[in-house]
A protein has these predicted regions:
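Conserved Helicase C-terminal RecA-like lobe
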Residues: 1-18, 186-336, 401-409
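SF2 helicase motor core recognition
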Residues: 68-74, 121-124, 283-287, 309-313, ...
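Conserved helix-turn-beta segment of the N-terminal RecA-like "Helicase ATP-binding" lobe
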Residues: 22-46, 136-137
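Conserved helicase motor
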Residues: 21, 41-50, 64-70, 92-96, ...
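Structural recognition of the conserved hydrophobic beta-strand(s) that form the central parallel beta-sheet
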Residues: 16, 62-63, 84, 111-117, ...
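A conserved SF2-helicase RecA2
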Residues: 351-409
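Conserved P-loop NTPase motor "coupling/switch" region that bridges the ATPase
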Residues: 11-13, 28, 37, 82, ...
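Short basic/glycine-enriched coil/helix segment immediately N-terminal to the Walker B
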Residues: 54-58, 71-81, 105-107
């Protein structure tokens, strides 16, 4: 569409803002495939280098969210008349510096396309920042007023969506075009399955000890969303194989039962496998075990540089090795195509419905030729409760205190 507008003389230059992890692997590669006659540059690195790239006058410049803040003045003067924001939910909060920086860059005659599959994944309030940027007249001046339009206050700490919240969100996000995956792609089916995992004796011991401690802490006290999230996170960490103690140390657990089930899933899979692991230390434990067993494995997490991620993704898609990617969900939940795999395993659940859905979509997208399976490893009641909410597409953050009480009962 952007290339068409260029051909029509309506657009001269395009700025693409996207996650760091997909600047090369998705955007540069896709532009090369679909618009090989256009010039493309990726603005990444030190500020001086980014500025130099922007000044080169290529047709497309691809930059990550934080990079926009670093070279905002250069972007203002860069002659961009179309701005494309991929995974636009990163701009849902109009109070952030990130949002304000981009808003200042946009001129009245700037084309703006904000792309997301989940415009209000966590709450109807998430739509406010997107709407205020695309069509400011569609929403009130203040976010609190919009929140009152779409949410009802139940307690000091709890808000729930109003019955007509979805209609309100749809209205304020116009103009918009929506395509479902089924409308765009003829994809093989996707199946969700649960695999029961027995906690080891050591895990059970510490899990029950922590539950008793948490029950004592909340007895007679009001449970807040903050302490509920902290407590639940500790229970999930124990279930996954490593828990961070109050003094910053890490306590590791035997993961033999969970690992055995994972190996069964890997052995059963006809293609490659993605394993999503929310906790960093558990990533290291699991990866060591897989490599020790001779399974070629690479890690994708926050500490892996953008060039290294691009190289790993390319190798995963095109070569026989690695067979398994162990991924911290937030590091590769958006934009990346990983269709060399047809099996997704959740070593432990995440609390974000958006991250969960987007991560699963890494395999179920254009180019997939095989039936896909999402496997949830469930060992503790905390994990089962979280997966239940994810399966029912319920925003966990709005239910965190209720969920916490259920787990402790």
């Amino acid at each position: 569409a952007s290339d068409f507008l260029m051909q029509q003389g309506k657009v001269n230059r395009v700025l693409v803002i996207c996650p760091l992890s997909i600047m090369d692997s998705a955007w540069r590669n896709d532009l090369f495939d679909f618009a090989p006659h256009r010039t493309v540059a990726v603005a990444h690195g030190e500020a001086k280098k980014r500025k130099s790239i922007i000044e080169q006058n290529t047709d497309y410049v691809v930059i990550n969210y934080d990079g926009v803040e670093i070279v905002s003045e250069s972007i203002k003067n860069g002659g961009f008349d179309l701005v494309i924001v991929d995974e636009a939910t990163h701009y849902k909060n109009a109070q952030t510096r990130r949002w304000k920086t981009l808003n200042k860059i946009l001129r009245d005659n700037t084309w703006l396309w904000m792309m997301t599959g989940t415009p209000a994944a966590q709450s109807p309030v998430d739509a406010y920042g997107l709407a205020k940027m695309v069509n400011p007249t569609a929403v009130p001046r203040f976010g609190g007023t919009f929140r009152d339009m779409v949410m009802t206050k139940i307690t000091n700490f709890k808000w729930i969506p109003k019955a007509d919240a979805t209609n309100t969100v749809h209205r304020v996000l116009q103009p918009a075009i929506r395509f479902t995956k089924d409308e765009c792609l003829d994809l093989p089916s996707m199946t969700y399955v649960k695999r029961a995992v027995e906690l080891t004796r050591q895990q059970k011991k510490y899990y029950e000890q922590l539950k008793r401690k948490l029950v004592l802490e909340v007895t007679g006290e009001q449970v807040t969303a903050v302490n509920a999230a902290v407590g639940m996170n500790k229970l999930l960490q124990i279930s996954s194989g490593a828990v961070y103690t109050d003094d910053g140390a890490t306590l590791e657990f035997d993961i033999k039962h969970r690992y055995k089930v994972l190996r069964e899933v890997i052995d059963e899979s006809s293609q490659k496998v993605l394993v999503f692991v929310p906790f960093k230390h558990a990533i290291n434990i699991l990866t060591d075990r897989l490599r020790k067993d001779g399974i070629s494995t690479e890690i994708i997490q926050g500490s892996v540089s953008a060039p290294a991620r691009t190289s790993i993704f390319k190798q995963f898609q095109e070569a026989t090795s690695p067979r398994v990617l162990v991924i911290q969900p937030a590091s590769a939940a958006h934009g990346v195509t990983l269709t060399a795999a047809n099996t997704v395993v959740w070593w432990s659940p995440v609390s974000s419905l958006e991250t969960y859905a987007q991560a699963n979509a890494r395999v179920h997208r254009s180019g997939q030729k095989h039936k896909c399976t999402v496997v949830q490893l469930q060992g503790s009641d905390a994990e089962k409760h979280v997966y239940r909410l994810l399966d029912n597409r319920i925003n966990i953050h709005t239910k965190i205190t209720d969920l916490y009480k259920e787990i402790l009962d």
